[in-house]
Design a protein with these regions (language model features):
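N-terminal single-pass transmembrane signal-anchor helix
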Residues: 2-30
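Residue-level detector of intrinsically disordered/flexible regions characterized by low predicted structural confidence
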Residues: 4, 108-109, 143
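Membrane-proximal N-terminal amphipathic helix
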Residues: 35-62
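Extracellular/periplasmic head regions of type IV pilus-like filament subunits
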Residues: 58-131
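Low-complexity, S/T/G/P-rich flexible repeat/linker segments used as non-globular hinges
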Residues: 125-146
Length: 146
């Protein structure tokens, strides 16, 4: 009678193969979940920026000078733009408790305006867009309308 205190080579190979198959199916699911979460965070950040810029517009409207925050030179809300002095003396960072949000890859969003004249009414829109090619929310936009 043989005393067996360990695994045979075949048992070890089968176990490693099964673990490999399980990991192979779990990694894409994990990656997809991370990507969806990052996209949600980016869209939430863009929505927060839009809401703050809309509030800035309404705050200035109350004192008789309605306008959106100044546009960045190259549309990117980067470090240079974050320190730009706005019409009321604040910087964009000050509108966000000292930290204008970036996307999950730490890249700035794009900010620009659009205007439409429809039925004799002028509609102004601000657009916040993710332009980072590596971002899961690439080309997603959040639009605010006045």
């Amino acid at each position: 009678m043989k005393n067996s205190n360990g695994f045979t080579l075949i048992e070890l190979v089968v176990t490693i193969a099964l673990v490999g198959i399980l990991l192979g199916s779990a990694i894409p699911t994990f990656h997809r979940a991370v990507s969806e979460t990052q996209s949600s965070v980016n869209i939430s950040n863009m929505t927060i920026i839009k809401q703050s810029f809309m509030q800035y517009y309404y705050d200035n409207h109350m004192i008789g000078d309605p306008h959106f925050p100044r546009l960045p030179q190259d549309s990117l809300m980067d470090n240079t733009y974050r320190q730009t002095i706005l019409g009321d003396g604040r910087t964009p960072d000050m509108l966000f408790s000292g930290n204008l949000p970036y996307n999950t890859n730490q890249k700035p969003y794009i900010y620009y305006w659009e205007s439409d004249t429809l039925n004799g009414h002028i509609t102004n829109r601000i657009v916040i867009q993710d332009s980072d090619l590596d971002s899961p929310s690439y080309n997603e936009k959040v639009v605010g309308e006045i």
